[in-house]
Amino acid sequence: MGKIEAKNIEKFFQHDGKPLKALGGVNLTVSDGEFVCIVGPSGCGKSTFLRILAGLEKPDGGEIMLDGKKLADTGPERIMVFQEGALFPWLTVRDNVEYGLKIAGIPEKERKEISNRYLDMLSLIHI
């Protein structure tokens, strides 16, 4: 993927008519191949920060860079796994597994091979 950088990320919300700082000058650099966990108590801004990294929310200050290029919107190079269930209820189990692959332009035959491997691994192949 490459190196992703968050530089001086700020985010404010309104609370009782006053600005409430959710994120204040957050900086993070994650190089290709690194594995990072963001931990903290409920309400400290973890999800807000991840939503900004994924392009689902805009910061009130700062910028997100991918390989030195400023990111402005969502894109296929970024994803987010949500805390709550995020299945599409109108799709089958297989179609849910293949959804991201389809969006990424993976051919149908290859999608089936990939989904078969993981559905079998989880004993869900017959669902």
Where are these regions (language model features)?
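Conserved ABC transporter NBD signature motif
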Residues: 62-74
